[in-house]
Each structure stands twice: as structure tokens, then as C-alpha cells.
Amino acid sequence: MTDAIDQLFPAHLQHVQALADRALEREGYDGLVVYSGRPGLHFLDDHGPAFKANPHFLHWAPLQEAPDCFVRYLPGRRPQLVFHQPADYWHKPPAVPTAAWTREFDLTVIREPAAARGLLDAGNRRLACIGELPAEFAEWGFSATNPAGLLAYLHYHRAAKTPYELACMREASLLGAVGHVAAEKAYRAGASEFEVHQAYCSAVGLREQELPYGNIIAFGEGAAILHYTTLGRRRDVPRPTFLIDAGAQFRGYASDITRTHIADAAGTDPTFLELMASMEKLQLELCAAVRPGFDYRQIHLLAHRLIAGALVQSGVVTGCTAEQAAENGVSGVFFPHGIGHLLGIQVHDVAGLAADDSGRTEIPRPAGHRYLRLTRRLEPGVVVTIEPGLYFIDLLLDEAQQNGLGRYIAWDVVRRLQPYGGIRIEDDVACTASGAPENLTRDAFAKVA
């Protein structure tokens, strides 16, 4: 599979160069330098968080663990990769890359970051630089650092993925599916949340710092906390449900997958079982709506109508129709987040609200839906998450009792269901030119079944 993906890289890099050509011409620059970044330190400490490469750098070169590296690009020329391999006996220096993709670059190895200055110099040309630059780079003569117009153009067009990027995301999805299967097995064997997390990391072969985001491993009521990352150490806790939101990465591209499991159908409240079945059905319906030209906001609003229908049908919501529950805010008590987001190099990929590539105008969220991360129309190559949720969150339920929405809620049913926490199902779905969406997540689970 790696060889097949390598064959897609040259066309991907040509696409990245073409984006840079247009962005540089529009913004009045002669060339581009992209800096990979440098690890920082914790306050008053000589240790710091794990290094995370600049996503713009990863768009050019799949080097996740390569600090103080640069890509320099002048339109019409081969891109230059300046690779920093320090002379260091405290830490193992990164190996000079030799993979097939490096043939597309002029590769130069340096021992000190300062040595890059002369290599990046382009005479009187106006160079824009993208990255978080250390103070000592301030005098290197870049015409601009992180210019807004340039970033806006590149961010907007990064939404549509190349065949290479889609191939990487399929691999990330496959890794994630393997991890999810291992995690469910550990849960059913009685492991703690922390031990389930360890089983996941072991199965995907990634250190915690290499995951695209912190794993959400929640038993029971913990599933009602949207970003529950506590990872409890005890095994002897209530565990009627298991919600896992965990992804993987391949060459810098992420997967973002959520599943909800029950411990034992026979011992589970029938109403919760009904809601589980309804959420599975409606999630697939929402995935099917990922088609070219479709307004993602409409998928979000459809999710509210469908979830409202499940709440009314199950008896959790009473005294109003599903349509009314979606309009009056009752559905938001149980589904308080957006239906999803763009996915790619970054888990919450950029420019989700952008009206165009100028960066000056945003497409507004629907009124009352402030947490929606994507408002654009879909186009071929775009990958989005579809993640409807239904939760029993104390804070929001308390607010409903205070603001009048509580009159539509069957509190006896809610109290019965609160120990289960909630339900979320999340797939990564690619919009295709043919119209039929490609569900990266479901395809991956089918391969590991």
C-alpha cells in the first residue's frame, strides 16, 4: 500500500505548488518558505510538550517529527527541502529522509538551524514565510510572516483533498478501526478506561503524543461529557455504556472516529436500546447527504430534526412534534454540538466558515447553532465528519428546567437514562465527484471485521 501511495505523491505536490503559485501571485510575493516549527518548553522548565509540525509544512512534506526544517519554493522551480539533522548526543537525531517522495525535492542537510539562512536567501525576491518563527529568525529578511491573505487562500483550498491525501486518510481510518476493535475487546474484558486507552494505542502502534487528538474513553455517565479525557484507572465503576472517540494518523493525516457500545443488551433499558438503534439509522442517513453542492448547514439542521424525531418517538420529549422540538431548542438540550467539521492534516481542519478564499467573509452559522464548525457547500475531495450525538448532560438539563424547555421533557424517562451518559456515532466521509459519498470509516471497519 505504501508504494501505491508514494506513486500519488508527485501529483499531490504539483497541486500544492499550483496553489502556492496562485496565492503568491495574488498577494504579490515571489516565493514561499514554510518552516516546520520548533519544540517549546513548559513555563520555568527545561522540558516541553511533544513537537507538532506546522500543518502547512506537512502539506508539502510528510515529516511529522522534523523540527527546524524548511521548504523553500520559487514558482517554476523544484521545491527545496532543508532538513535539520543536528549533531547531538543527548537525543537521537532524525534520520535524513530517503523515501520515494524526497525525489521531488532538492534536499539539503544542515547541522544548525542558522545554516538555513543562506540556503533560503532569494536575493531581492519577496519571500513570504509561514510558520511560528523563533526570535533569531527575525532578521532573515522575509517580506512577511504568515500574511493573512496568503493563509486565507491556502486554507480555503486545502479543504478539497488530492488522491494522495485521500489515500493517507484511508490508511488513518484503517488504523483507527483496528484500534476501536481492540478497545471494545478490552472494555468487554473488564479493563479500566485507562487500560482501554492503552489497548487502543498498542493496537494502532502510536504513542499518545502521535495520536491526532486525546482519546475520549468514557464509561456510563462519562459519555455525557463531550470531551471526556479523564481516563479513569479503576475497573470497579459503573460501565453500562462505553463511548470511544479516538482516531489515528498516517503521514500527518487524521481519522476521527466515534462509537458507542452497551455492556449487555439484556440488561439495558429498552428506551436506551431504541435510541441506540435510532441514532445508528439516522447517522447513516446523514452520511448519505454528503454530496457535491450540498450546504453542510442543512446536514446539521437535518440532524436536529432527525434526533428530535428519535426523542419524541422514544418518549424522552413530549408535548410537541419533532419539527417543533428542532425549532424551539429542545433538540439542542440533547444535541448541543455541531454535526461535524472538515478533516485532514488538522482534526478540525481550517476555513470551515470561509465564504471564499479571500478570508474576509464568513458564511454564518444557523441562528442558535454557535458550535457548528463548517458552513460551506461541499465539493468533491472534501472530507467531513458526521457525528450526531444524544446526551443526558446535567448542566443542560438544569438549564432546560429554568428556561421553560423542561415542560417538553419526560423527566422520569431522563432520570432512567442518565446512567448511560449518551450516544455519539462518528464517521469520516469523503464527498466525491460521482455523487455517492465514500465512507472512509465504515469501509475501514468492514476490512477489519
Question: Which residues does each predicted region cover?
Answer:
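Active-site neighborhoods and metal-handling regions in enzymes and metal-associated proteins
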Residues: 1-449
